[in-house]
């Protein structure tokens, strides 16, 4: 331990001890006041003493003189490094270069040709700024809207304007949909109308909003005032209406459907749907009748005859007995097979075997069908879905949605099924084309609340069976609808199935007959 009584030495020692550890320089700031006072004190004392005393005290003052380091400056701007001259010069050159970019140099050239005074005056024409034309400002959007206000007051669909989502973008959930309008002309039909609706609106509300926007924009032709006369169909990106699917349910919310392109179609006068409607020709035979589906009246009678022969258990025209067609109203008068259906002026014909007349054939009971049955036959090709239960092995059932149309039968599993997850049964979607559909039969009917039916179809040269169950009314409706579709189509798979079934029945009958004959 050392005892020091010289303040200069103590200050120098503290400053040198903390100079390497204190980066902030606060050690110098704390002692700077005392340092200044001592400096003033020693300056006054040095001026009053002689030189001998200064030499004697030289050893003591030497510590104060060299107490301050050369690299340390006791000032308020400590720690700030001054910029070098080179950096300042480069900054100045950079600013000058930026200023030169903003300036444009134009080279002056003396004109070689002399221009007249008129030409010079036309180059720099004098304008009179005192006379200014009255500035007629552009009409504002508000003024245009106010002028169109009487038209909007007469809009019969004003009650659906509250579902317009153009003013709610960013605040409320909205949905943007491109709508094709089938009632417009061919040119305007190609361009969709963009509609923005709120997400919680129903399909019925969206139809009303489309009609409101259609009327507000002044489109032609004018729409029917009844919103129920229209429906929304799924549409392709080019505007083609997909009539294979039914229209959207008007009571469902629009956010349930993920389609961004729809088509507004009139329910009872849809050109897209009318083009797909088919005609049915009735062919009377010796043991019943059949309905032949044709696309148009331009089909030849030869094609109708071939379809009718295929319907008779797959028989062909060039094999077996030969047949001809006659009008039901004109017996024994063959129909020209090269003519079209349009030239016959009839949709009911009779299938007669060659070299025989209609009177020589076995008497046939007149089959009477009422109008309701004919309507059921014609409407059987329209799509309709049923909710039934599909029966698996070990009698496990799965709830599915059975969709039936004239082209195919679709089986889609219903989501969130507790039974399927419990027994590890995961039903996959199945699509059966009508050409490979063979039969639909009622399996059993125990009570009005429970019945079973079987669907048979051809898959990889093998006949497969699917069993379903539901209430008796639904099952009977499904079986009748599928059989109407099968009767109106010429399916080779169905004909082969019945032929194979007939052969098995014949073989079984002959075997039982031989078994009964042996004891005798």
UniProtKB/Swiss-Prot annotation:
Give start and end of each CRIM domain.
139-267
- The annotated region (SIN1-type RBD) lies at 279-353
The organism sits in which domain of life?
Eukaryota
Localization annotation: Cell membrane; Endoplasmic reticulum membrane; Early endosome membrane; Late endosome membrane
Topological relation to the membrane, as annotated: Peripheral membrane protein
Q: Quote the InterPro entries the UniProt record gives.
A: CRIM_dom (IPR031567), PH-like_dom_sf (IPR011993), Sin1/Avo1 (IPR008828), Sin1_N (IPR032679), Sin1_PH_dom (IPR031313)
Give the regulation of activity: Phosphatidylinositol 3,4,5-trisphosphate (PI(3,4,5)P3) promotes MTOR activation by relieving MAPKAP1/SIN1-mediated inhibition of MTOR that takes place in absence of PI(3,4,5)P3.
Gene3D superfamilies in the cross-refs = Pleckstrin-homology domain (PH domain)/Phosphotyrosine-binding domain (PTB) (2.30.29.30)
Region annotation Disordered: residue ranges?
A: 310-333
Q: Which residues form the SIN1-type PH domain?
A: 382-487
Q: Name one GO cellular component term.
A: endoplasmic reticulum
For the keyword DNA-binding, the answer is no
Where along this sequence does the record place binding of a 1,2-diacyl-sn-glycero-3-phospho-(1D-myo-inositol-3,4,5-trisphosphate)? 393, 428, 464
Give one GO term, molecular function aspect: enzyme-substrate adaptor activity
| Pfam families on file | CRIM, RBD_SIN1, SIN1, SIN1_PH
What GO biological process, any one, is recorded here? TORC2 signaling
Keywords, comma-separated and alphabetical? Cell membrane, Cytoplasm, Endoplasmic reticulum, Endosome, Golgi apparatus, Lysosome, Membrane, Mitochondrion, Mitochondrion outer membrane, Nucleus
Where is it mostly found? Answer: membrane
Subunit? Component of the mechanistic target of rapamycin complex 2 (mTORC2), consisting in two heterotretramers composed of MTOR, MLST8, RICTOR and MAPKAP1/SIN1. Contrary to mTORC1, mTORC2 does not bind to and is not sensitive to FKBP12-rapamycin.
User: Which family does the UniProt entry place this protein in?
Assistant: Belongs to the SIN1 family.
| Domains as described in the record | The CRIM domain forms a ubiquitin-like fold with a characteristic acidic loop, which recognizes and binds AGC protein kinase family members substrates.
Biological function: Component of the mechanistic target of rapamycin complex 2 (mTORC2), which transduces signals from growth factors to pathways involved in proliferation, cytoskeletal organization, lipogenesis and anabolic output. In response to growth factors, mTORC2 phosphorylates and activates AGC protein kinase family members, including AKT (AKT1, AKT2 and AKT3), PKC (PRKCA, PRKCB and PRKCE) and SGK1. In contrast to mTORC1, mTORC2 is nutrient-insensitive.
Q: What is this protein called?
A: Target of rapamycin complex 2 subunit MAPKAP1
């Amino acid at each position: 331990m050392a005892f020091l009584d010289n303040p200069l030495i103590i200050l120098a020692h503290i400053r040198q001890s903390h100079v390497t550890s204190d980066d902030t320089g606060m050690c110098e700031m704390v002692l700077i006041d005392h340092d200044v006072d001592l400096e003033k004190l020693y300056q006054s004392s040095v001026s009053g003493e002689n030189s001998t005393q200064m030499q004697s005290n030289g050893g003591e003052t030497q510590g104060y003189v060299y107490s301050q380091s050369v690299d340390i400056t006791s000032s308020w701007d400590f720690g700030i490094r001054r910029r070098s001259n080179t950096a300042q010069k480069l900054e100045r050159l950079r600013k000058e270069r930026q200023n030169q970019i903003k300036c444009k140099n134009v080279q002056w050239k003396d004109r070689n040709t002399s221009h007249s005074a008129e030409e010079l005056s036309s180059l720099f024409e004098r304008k009179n700024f005192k006379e200014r034309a009255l500035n007629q400002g552009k009409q504002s959007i508000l003024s245009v809207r106010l002028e169109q206000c009487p038209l909007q007051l007469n809009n019969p669909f004003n009650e659906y304007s509250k579902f317009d989502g153009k003013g709610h973008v960013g605040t409320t959930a909205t949905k943007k949909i491109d709508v094709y309008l089938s009632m417009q002309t061919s040119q305007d039909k190609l361009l969709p109308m963009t509609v923005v609706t709120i997400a919680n609106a129903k399909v019925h509300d969206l139809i009303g909003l489309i009609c409101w926007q259609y009327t507000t924009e002044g489109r032609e032709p004018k729409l029917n005032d009844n919103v129920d006369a229209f429906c929304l169909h799924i549409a392709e990106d080019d505007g083609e209406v997909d009539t294979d699917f039914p229209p959207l349910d008007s009571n469902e919310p629009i956010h349930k459907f993920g389609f961004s392109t729809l088509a507004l179609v009139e329910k009872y006068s849809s050109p897209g749907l009318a083009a797909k409607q088919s005609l049915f020709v009735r062919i009377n035979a010796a043991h019943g009748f059949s309905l032949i589906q044709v696309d148009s009246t331009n089909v030849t009678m030869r094609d109708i005859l071939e379809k009718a022969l295929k319907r008779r258990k797959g028989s062909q025209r060039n094999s077996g007995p030969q047949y001809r067609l006659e009008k039901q109203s004109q017996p024994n008068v063959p129909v020209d097979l090269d003519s079209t259906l349009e030239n016959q002026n009839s949709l009911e014909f009779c299938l007669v075997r060659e070299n025989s007349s209609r009177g020589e054939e076995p008497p046939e009971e007149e089959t009477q069908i009422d109008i309701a049955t004919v309507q059921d036959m014609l409407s059987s090709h329209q799509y309709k879905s049923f909710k039934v239960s599909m029966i698996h092995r070990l009698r496990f059932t799965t709830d599915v949605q059975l969709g039936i149309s004239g082209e195919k039968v679709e089986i889609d599993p219903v989501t969130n099924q507790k039974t399927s997850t419990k027994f590890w049964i995961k039903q996959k979607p199945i699509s059966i084309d009508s050409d490979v559909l063979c039969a639909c039969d009622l399996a059993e009917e125990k009570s009005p609340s429970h019945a079973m039916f079987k669907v048979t179809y051809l898959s990889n040269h093998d006949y497969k069976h699917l069993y379903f169950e539901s209430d008796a009314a639904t099952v009977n409706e499904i079986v009748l609808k599928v059989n109407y579709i099968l009767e109106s189509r010429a399916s080779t798979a169905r004909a082969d199935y019945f032929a194979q079934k007939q052969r098995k029945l014949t073989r079984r009958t002959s075997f039982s007959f031989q078994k009964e004959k042996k004891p005798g």
